[in-house]
Amino acid sequence: KARAVEAIRVPHPVRGTVSLVEWHMARARNHIHVLEENMALLMEQAIANEGLFYRLLYLQRSLTAASSLDDMLMRFHRWARDLGLAGASLRLFPDRWRLGAPSNHTHLALSRQSFEPLRIQRLGQEQHYLGPLNGPELLVVLPEAKAVGSVAMSMLGSDADLGVVLFTSRDASHYQQGQGTQLLHEIALMLPELLERWIERV
């Protein structure tokens, strides 16, 4: 039977015909090559995810150690600067947070009505936006920012209705659609709980 199997010829697009054994060996080699490529990709992803995990862990520890809201916002901004960004900002919807007296954090307030056209235009049904903002849009979310080339913007909270977190870069091509948003997503979920230490939810 073994000799009979070896004698079987299989059509081959380049070599005309090959033996069944050769054909199976070639398939096995190809399969191993695909597995090796997949394994390399998985390793790359694991290393990238580990990097994201440690960045997030460092940020969480730093923000948890803050002595005030201003200290927390400064630590958040510094963390972004350490990553080579221009900065990081938070804007909160006043119908979800008590931003007036006595806490007096009105500078964080973002009118939902003012933000809505930008949200529809840039985010649509998505929770994150990566790319440029035009002048009027920047005035809505980052009125004091200068030389912003591109932003990574994410809606805060699991229901995406508490406010916005923004990372800014002076480089217009730094943030682009199609880039990964895993770290952004985790930060947007983590921040509201940390903010509740200093600001009461409505």
Predicted regions and their residues:
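Short, positively charged
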Residues: 1-12
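Signal-transmission linkers at sensory-effector interfaces
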Residues: 13-62
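Helix-loop-beta substructure at the N-terminus of cytosolic sensory domains
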Residues: 65-106
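Allosteric regulatory "coupling" segments in signal-transduction proteins
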Residues: 97-128
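Signal-transducing coupling segments at domain and membrane junctions
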Residues: 126-150
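A short, aliphatic-rich beta-strand micro-motif
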Residues: 149-157
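Short hydrophobic/glycine-rich mini-motifs in sensory/regulatory modules
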Residues: 156-166, 171
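Regulatory loop-to-helix N-cap segments in sensory/regulatory domains
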Residues: 169-185, 195-202
